[in-house]
C-alpha cells in the first residue's frame, strides 16, 4: 500500500519521468518550485511504494488579497499518478493530502478527468472565466463568420472605445523599478475583492526570471506616473495578453493596452486573453474581440468560505501554470529549431 512520503531534491528526475519526461521541465524546475517569490518552501504531496513515487501533486505557494486581507494560498499543479496505479484511488489519497497543505487551494486549467474529483473534494467552480480572441487572418469559413462577429462587436462598442486617452504607453523588455511597481500594487489592490498579490517580487520572478520565456511589458503612464502594466507574449503569430496590473475601474488603461497589442504586432494573426475581469472583457468586445465558447476551468477550495471563496476573483492567463508550461514549451521549441543545445 502506498505511503505518504516527504519530497527530497534528488527525486526531481524521478518526478519528471512520472510526468512523461517533459523536455523543458528540468530547465524550469528550480525556478518554478525552489525560488518562491514569497519565501515559501517547496512541499509537494508524494506517495511512495517500495521506494518508487507512485503519486505526486506539486503546489506553488503564493499570497492573495482576499476580502481586504493578505492571506497564504496554494496553486495546485503537476498532479500525476503512475500509470500502473491509476484507477486504484491513489488520486483521491493525493488530493486528501494536499487539502492538509493549505486553507485555500486554487486550480486553473483543469482536465475533464480531474474536474469531478475536485468537485467531490470540496472545490467550487468559478463562473467568470472567459476566453477572448481576435483573428486577423481568414483562412476558413468558420473564421470568416467569427470575423463578422468581431466587426459587429466593435460597432456595438464604438462609443465605449472611441474616446481619446491622454496617457502615454511604453513598450519595454523590463519591468519598471521595484518602488514604482509596489506603489502601483498598493494603490490598486483594495479595488479588488480577490486577487493574487502582484507586487514587484512576484511579477519579477514570474516574467523576468523565467529561465526560457521572454515577455514584453506595456506601461501606461499619465504625467509620467505609472498607471498600469500589461504583460504580453508572442509566439508564431499568436499574441497573448498574459497579465495586467491596474485599478479595477481603470477602463482607459485597459483599452490603451489592448489597442497597443495590434500596434506592436501588426503581422500577427491571432490575439488571445483569458480573464475573469468584467471591465477587461467589456473592453475586448468593444475593440472587436469575440468571446470563445471554450474556456479553462478555475476551481477554488477555501476552508472558511468555500461557496463564496470561488467568486469575485481577478484572474488572468498568467495565473495558470498552464501558461508557465506553454511559455516554456514555445521557447524550448524555438531553441530546438535554432539548433541550440
Descriptions of predicted regions:
Residues 46, 52-63, 75, 80, ...:
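Conserved beta-strand in the GNAT
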Residues 105-160, 222, 233-251, 258-341:
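Active-site/acyl-donor-binding loops of N-acyltransferases
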Residues 1-53, 70-75, 129, 150-201, ...:
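Short amphipathic alpha-helix that is part of the acyltransferase structural core
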Residues 42, 102-104, 213-215, 266-270:
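Short, high-confidence coil segments that cap the C-terminus of an alpha-helix
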Residues 81, 86-100, 250-263:
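Conserved acetyl-CoA-binding loop-helix of GNAT-fold acetyltransferases
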Residues 34, 61-67, 92-95:
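Catalytic micro-motifs at enzyme active sites that drive phosphoryl/nucleotidyl and oxygen chemistry
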Residues 73, 77-83, 244-248:
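Glycine-rich phosphate-binding "P-loop"
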Residues 178-232:
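Non-catalytic interaction/regulatory modules that flank or connect domains
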Amino acid at each position: 500500500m502506498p505511503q505518504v512520503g516527504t519530497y527530497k531534491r534528488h527525486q526531481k528526475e524521478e518526478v519528471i519521468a512520472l510526468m512523461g519526461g517533459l523536455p523543458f521541465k528540468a530547465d524550469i524546475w528550480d525556478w518554478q518550485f525552489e525560488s518562491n517569490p514569497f519565501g515559501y518552501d517547496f512541499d509537494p504531496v508524494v506517495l511512495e511504494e517500495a521506494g518508487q513515487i507512485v503519486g505526486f501533486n506539486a503546489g506553488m505557494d503564493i499570497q492573495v488579497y482576499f476580502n481586504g486581507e493578505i492571506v497564504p494560498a496554494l496553486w495546485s499543479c503537476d498532479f500525476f499518478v503512475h500509470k500502473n496505479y491509476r484507477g486504484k484511488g491513489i488520486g483521491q489519497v493525493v488530493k486528501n493530502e494536499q487539502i492538509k497543505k493549505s486553507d485555500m487551494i486554487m486550480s486553473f486549467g483543469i482536465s475533464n478527468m480531474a474536474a469531478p474529483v475536485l468537485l467531490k473534494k470540496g472545490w467550487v467552480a468559478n463562473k467568470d472565466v472567459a476566453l477572448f480572441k481576435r483573428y486577423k487572418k481568414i483562412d476558413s469559413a468558420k473564421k470568416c463568420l467569427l470575423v463578422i462577429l468581431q466587426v459587429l462587436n466593435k460597432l456595438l462598442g464604438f462609443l465605449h472605445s472611441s474616446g481619446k486617452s491622454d496617457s502615454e504607453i511604453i513598450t519595454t523588455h523590463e519591468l519598471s523599478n521595484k518602488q514604482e511597481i509596489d506603489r502601483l500594487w498598493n494603490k490598486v489592490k483594495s479595488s479588488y475583492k480577490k486577487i493574487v498579490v502582484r507586487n514587484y517580487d512576484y511579477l519579477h520572478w514570474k516574467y523576468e526570471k523565467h529561465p526560457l520565456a521572454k515577455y514584453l511589458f506595456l506601461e501606461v503612464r499619465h504625467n509620467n506616473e505609472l498607471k498600469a502594466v500589461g504583460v504580453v507574449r508572442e509566439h508564431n503569430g499568436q499574441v497573448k495578453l498574459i497579465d495586467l496590473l491596474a485599478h479595477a475601474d481603470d477602463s482607459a488603461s485597459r483599452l490603451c493596452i489592448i489597442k497597443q497589442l495590434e500596434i506592436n504586432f501588426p503581422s500577427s494573426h491571432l490575439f488571445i486573453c483569458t480573464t475573469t475581469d468584467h471591465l477587461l472583457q467589456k473592453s475586448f468586445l468593444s475593440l472587436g474581440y469575440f468571446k470563445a465558447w471554450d474556456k479553462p476551468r478555475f476551481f477554488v477550495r477555501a476552508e472558511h468560505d468555500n461557496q463564496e471563496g470561488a467568486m469575485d476573483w481577478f484572474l488572468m492567463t498568467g495565473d495558470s501554470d498552464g501558461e508557465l508550461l506553454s511559455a516554456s514549451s514555445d521557447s524550448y521549441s524555438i531553441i530546438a529549431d535554432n539548433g541550440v543545445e
